[in-house]
Amino acid sequence: MSVFTEAELAYLHTGLLARVATIGKDGTPHIAPVGMWSHNPDFDAVDVTGFDFDHTKKFRDVARNGRATIVVDDMVKLDPAERQPGGWDSRPRGIEVRGRADAITNPQPMIRIHPERIISWGIESATERNARNVSASTWRR
């Protein structure tokens, strides 16, 4: 059984752009857009990669301190019947996965984020927010 809901897994596979956050050696947060990630069912983790990935700051940060967060989000256009008078014409949805991370070089450079906290919004329903801690004992190895 995955730490992600079926709806969260489906959403992870549809995103076009995400952001990965890491912490630099001086403690400064670093956030960068990424376009290549996937759920790794063998580890129930999120694998992130990209061009020349082992030469990126995010890769070096994870190699040094073993922590990362990925956020995948977007806006969903509302049907005119769903809109409140004077309200927004779209609503946010997304998922944030925080956790321990590995900087992997073989078979290709990537960051593997092992979830410790998952927060999703607007995925299961327009108004539902799902935030939970994930115990290390639930990770697949």
Regions found by a protein language model. Name each.
Residues 34-37, 99-100:
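Hydrophobic/aromatic beta-strand elements that line small-molecule binding cavities or substrate pockets
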Residues 89-92, 96, 100-141:
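C-terminal edge-of-domain segments
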Residues 36-78:
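A short mixed-secondary-structure module that forms the rim of ligand-binding clefts
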Residues 14-18, 32, 42-44, 64-68, ...:
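A generic structural signal for short beta-strands and their flanking turns/coil linkers
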Residues 1-19:
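Short, basic/aromatic recognition patches
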Residues 23-26, 96:
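Short, acidic, Ser/Thr-enriched surface-loop or helix-capping motifs
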